[in-house]
Amino acid sequence: MISDLKEERLLPAVPGRSNQIELLRVTSKLLEQLQSKNTFPKELDNPLGCQLELTHRCNLRCNQCYNQSGCSKPDISFDKWMDVTRQLVDMSIFECVISGGEPLLLKDKLYKLMDILSNSGVRFIFVTNGLLLDERKVKRLSKYDYYWIQVSIDGSRPEIHDKIRGVKGSWKKAVNAAKLVSQAGLPLVISHVIQKDNIEYLDEMIKTSYLLGAKRMITGKFTFSGRAILNRKSIDVGYDKIRKAYQLLKIRHNEYEGKMDIVTSTDPAFYLRYRVIEPSNVLLIRPNGDVKVDCILPFKIGNVLNEKISSIWNRIGKSAWKNNEIIEYVKSIKEERDMISTRPRPYVDEDVLIR
């Protein structure tokens, strides 16, 4: 599975990981040694964390959206989400990613869910497009403990961001949201997806993120998933351009060291193999209740409407990455573009249920 990769076909990593394939080999060997001595688990009794995609609804229509947020599919009831959070507390998770869609569309109900988790010591990553974030909401969000609050900004200029995100005026609101988060003393992360319309302005975006007070900028080429697959002809950039962009990111990473972290998203072929190597440790729950083990893996392992989360985890979740169907899919992704042709395609085709 590792030997079929070619380093030159992987997206570069910033910072470090100059040889990603060697890292996979070393990690795999080390885990095998530790597990053979029973000093590192092969399976976990409970997941360490969970991502909650609280709604399909979104107030933007981003042309690269990995899960096609903004569709008209039904969400599970709020009462069910309350039940889900209580189940996760019973499973003693440590961290929770709050996302969507746009989670702030839940209005006051959002805080009820976060209260349940927070009261049990859960720490959050909060992902928002920033359109609905104002001083009042930032104040309410300030009561929780965060790894970071992530605001997505896909352009250093209004016309770039608004074109990518499909709504005029969205850049101004996103930038204001980032300022409010930073000024409140909360850990701000700017997420920036590189594509055809913004790649020439990457250096500007780095400076913009720093000026907004971000502690980190997470960036990288879009993932071939969801709307990015459907719109790939209009947003794709070639290997030469993307590699030059990553060279710039490496330079700026060194220049901004100690002031702002600049990190890149991980190449899917590398990332999926890394997940196969390590024990399953997280879950993702979709707005319709489907339970998955990863956001770009086109498989589901159950639904919270039909089964308790602990039962799903014990039945298949904790060993899901060792499932033959998943392993064969991972083997088929030798470079990022294989996600276009390999079936099922994430968030384009129906997820396959594994048992």
Task: Give the location of each predicted region.
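Radical SAM enzyme [4Fe-4S]-AdoMet core and its adjacent flexible, acidic
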Residues: 1-4, 10-11, 154, 159-279, ...
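Flexible mid-to-C-terminal extensions adjoining Fe-S/redox cofactors in radical SAM and related proteins
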Residues: 2-15, 23-34, 294-355
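Conserved alpha-helical substructure of the radical SAM core
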Residues: 2-148
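Alpha-helix boundary/capping residues
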Residues: 69, 88, 168, 209, ...
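Radical SAM/AdoMet-radical enzyme domain recognition
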Residues: 78-98, 106-221
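Alpha-helix boundary recognition
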Residues: 89, 118, 142, 210, ...
